[in-house]
């Protein structure tokens, strides 16, 4: 009986974590599963999915102004807390984006590109 209670105690937090829609860690969870247990999109409605919003990285304007900057093929996995997405860009910006409408809340320029990193 004691083993069963311990097992339930360890499994319950894992089940609750998958029901949460926040992605507070890289790739969703400490195991980097990139999985969210949501049933909003499924085989019967996937054809009807549309883009809700898009976001333009501040890197785009920087490259237009300075063609020597190269944003490489960097791909970031954002984290989501509440209604805010946090993402980094290939030129080292960090941004907070509204999950509701894709509007930029704030950006921070780390200037790592200045040192060629």
Residue positions per predicted region:
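Repeat-blade elements of multi-bladed beta-propeller folds
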Residues: 23-27, 69-93, 117
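Sec-dependent signal peptide recognition
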Residues: 1-7
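Short loop/turn segments that connect beta-strands within beta-propeller blades
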Residues: 98-101
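Predominantly a core beta-strand signature of beta-propeller blades
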Residues: 51, 103-107
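Blade/loop signatures of beta-propeller domains
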Residues: 18-58
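Extracytoplasmic beta-rich repeat domains
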Residues: 55-77, 107-117
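Hydrophobic h-region of N-terminal signal peptides that target proteins for export
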Residues: 8-17
């Amino acid at each position: 009986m004691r083993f069963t209670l311990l097992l339930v105690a360890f499994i319950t937090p894992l089940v609750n974590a998958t029901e949460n829609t926040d992605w507070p860690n890289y790739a969703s969870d400490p195991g980097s599963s990139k999985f969210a247990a949501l049933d909003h999109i499924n085989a019967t409605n996937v054809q009807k999915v549309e883009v809700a919003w898009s976001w333009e990285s501040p890197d785009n304007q920087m490259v237009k102004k300075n063609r020597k900057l190269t944003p490489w093929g960097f791909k970031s996995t954002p984290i989501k807390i509440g209604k805010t997405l946090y993402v980094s860009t290939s030129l080292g910006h960090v941004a907070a984006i509204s999950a509701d409408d894709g509007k930029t809340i704030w950006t921070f320029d780390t200037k790592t590109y200045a040192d060629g990193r």
